[in-house]
Design a protein with these regions (language model features):
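Active-site pocket-shaping loop/turn-to-helix segments
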Residues: 13-39, 59-62, 85-99, 138-146, ...
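N-terminal extracellular/periplasmic Venus flytrap/periplasmic-binding protein-like
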Residues: 11-13, 24, 28-33, 44, ...
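Conserved catalytic cysteine-centered active-site region
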Residues: 25, 57-111, 142-149, 222-249, ...
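Conserved beta-ketoacyl condensing-enzyme motif
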Residues: 22-113, 118-136, 189-213, 287-288, ...
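Glycine-/small-residue-rich "gating" segment that lines the acyl/pantetheine channel
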Residues: 121-159, 163, 218-243, 395
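Active-site-proximal alpha-helical scaffold in enzymes
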Residues: 87-118, 155-185, 256-263, 328, ...
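Condensing-enzyme catalytic core mediating Claisen C-C bond formation in acyl metabolism
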Residues: 1-27, 223-291, 295, 360-361, ...
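Phosphate/pyrophosphate-binding loops at sites that engage ATP/ADP/AMP, CoA/4′-phosphopantetheine
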Residues: 38-51, 154, 158-159, 265-269, ...
C-alpha cells in the first residue's frame, strides 16, 4: 500500500458568524481563494496534477449546497478536468475529506487530491421540509437534540462540573492568545479581501464595507474566570452548566489540505509536512455525542498497536468544554500535550472546515516541536467520534 503525505494546508482566518468579516462571503468563494493560494505556494506542482477536490461541509444546503467542492474547483485556477465532490460527517467533515482522499491515493485511484472543508454559518439556510424521521425521533430522540443539549447530557450524566468547564475554556482562550502573539497560526492563514455587512448597533442601519480577513477574529484574550462564571446557561437555564463561554464559537471559514502519494511528492520535489497514517470512526449514543472520541481514539490506537502515551500531540476539537474535559480525563491525555494553541472555544468552529484546520495545524506542530506522532479527534453530531493519526515527515 502506498504512503500518503500531507504536503501543505492553508485556511482563511476565522470570522464571527453574522457580525464578522465573512458574513457576506460564500463558502465556495472562500474555498476557491485558498485553493488558488495553495497552487501559488507550491509552484512545482502544476494545477493539472490535482485530480480531484473533496470538500467537507456540515450543512450542505442553501448557499452551501449544489456541491461546493465542484463549484470551488471551477471557480479556482484548476483546470476544468479536475473533479469535485462534497462530503458530510458534520463536525468531522474536514478530516473525513482528507481521509477519503488518502484512501483513494492508497488504493491507486489518484496521486494528488486537495481536500478540506468550509462552513459559513452566516449564510446557512437549512431546508426543514420533512426534516424529522418520525420513527427515528420516537426510537432515538437524542439524534435530533441540539448539540448544546447533548453537552448538558454529558455534564449531568458524567458529573462534569461548571467550574471544570469554565477552567478549561479559560485555558483555551489563554493558549490561543499566546499562539497569536507568537505567530503560531501565521503560516497557515491566507488573507482574503471581501465585503462585509456592517450594522450600527444603535440605529440598526447596515452598509456594505470593504474588509480583509487576515487573522482569526474570535479570540477573547481579556477573558477571566469570573467573567465566565457570570454567564448564564444557554440550553438548560435552570439547571445547566453549558454557556456561550465554555462552548465553541459560531464562525465562518474554510481550509484546504494538499494530500499526495509520497512518490508523487518526491517526483515533484515537494517537502511534505506529515504522513497520513490512519483514520477511524465509531458510534455512540446520540444524546451524548460529545464523548465520541472516547470510542474512536481507542479503536484508532488499537488498529496501529499504539497507546495514549505514544502520542506526542493531541488536537481534540473543542465543541464544548464539557466533552473535552470528559474525554481528556477518561482517555488520560495530559494537558501539556492537548490543544497546545487553543481550539474551537477560542478560535471558532466552522463545522465543515475544522477537521482540515486541525490536521494542518498538528502537521506543523509536529515539525516545529520535533515530535513524531499526533492525533486529531472530534465528536460528531448524531453520536460518533472520528480520529486520525499523523506522523511527522522526516527532515
Amino acid at each position: 500500500m502506498r504512503n500518503v503525505v500531507i504536503v501543505d494546508s492553508v485556511r482563511t482566518g476565522l470570522a464571527k458568524s453574522h457580525r464578522g468579516g465573512f458574513n457576506m462571503t460564500r463558502p465556495d468563494e472562500m474555498l476557491a481563494h485558498i485553493i488558488d493560494a495553495m497552487l501559488d505556494r507550491n509552484p512545482d506542482m502544476p494545477p493539472e496534477a490535482v485530480e480531484d477536490i473533496i470538500m467537507g461541509c456540515g450543512n450542505p444546503e442553501g448557499a452551501q449546497g449544489h456541491n461546493i467542492g465542484r463549484n470551488a474547483a471551477v471557480l479556482s485556477k484548476l483546470p476544468m478536468t479536475t473533479g469535485g465532490t462534497t462530503v458530510n460527517r458534520y463536525c468531522s467533515s474536514g478530516m473525513q475529506s482528507i481521509s477519503m482522499a488518502a484512501s483513494q491515493i492508497m488504493a491507486g485511484c489518484y496521486d494528488t487530491v486537495i481536500a478540506g472543508g468550509a462552513e459559513t454559518i452566516s449564510m446557512m439556510n437549512m431546508n426543514m421540509d420533512n426534516f424529522v424521521n418520525e420513527r427515528l425521533a420516537e426510537e432515538v430522540p437524542g439524534i435530533y437534540f441540539p448539540m448544546g443539549m447533548t453537552a448538558e447530557v454529558v455534564a449531568k450524566r458524567y458529573d462534569v462540573s461548571r467550574e471544570a468547564q469554565d477552567e478549561y475554556a479559560f485555558e483555551s482562550q489563554m493558549r490561543t492568545a499566546a499562539a497569536q502573539q507568537s505567530g503560531a497560526y501565521d503560516d497557515e492563514i491566507i488573507p482574503m479581501e471581501t465585503k462585509m455587512l456592517l450594522t450600527n448597533k444603535e440605529t440598526g442601519d447596515s452598509k456594505e464595507v470593504e474588509y480583509t480577513v487576515d487573522k482569526d477574529e474570535c479570540n477573547r484574550p481579556e477573558t477571566t474566570l469570573e467573567g465566565l462564571a457570570s454567564l448564564k446557561p444557554v440550553f438548560d437555564p435552570e439547571n445547566g452548566s453549558v454557556t456561550a463561554g465554555n462552548s465553541s464559537q459560531l464562525s465562518d471559514g474554510a481550509s484546504v489540505t494538499l494530500v499526495m502519494s509520497e512518490d508523487k511528492a518526491k517526483e515533484l520535489g515537494l517537502k511534505p509536512l506529515a504522513y497520513f497514517r490512519g483514520f477511524t470512526t465509531m458510534g455512540c449514543e446520540p444524546d451524548e455525542m460529545g464523548i465520541g472520541p472516547d470510542y474512536s481514539v481507542p479503536k484508532l490506537l488499537k488498529n496501529y498497536n499504539m497507546s495514549v502515551e505514544d502520542i506526542d500531540i493531541w488536537e481534540l476539537n473543542e465543541a464544548f468544554a464539557v466533552q473535552v474535559v470528559y474525554c481528556r480525563d477518561k482517555l488520560g491525555i495530559p494537558m501539556d500535550k492537548l490543544n497546545l494553541d487553543g481550539g474551537s472555544i477560542s478560535i471558532g468552529h466552522p463545522f465543515g472546515m475544522t477537521g482540515s484546520r486541525q490536521v494542518g495545524h498538528i502537521a506543523r506542530q509536529l515539525n516545529n516541536m520535533d515530535k513524531q506522532f499526533g492525533v486529531v479527534t472530534m465528536c460528531v453530531g448524531g453520536g460518533m467520534g472520528a480520529s486520525g493519526l499523523f506522523e511527522r515527515y522526516p527532515s
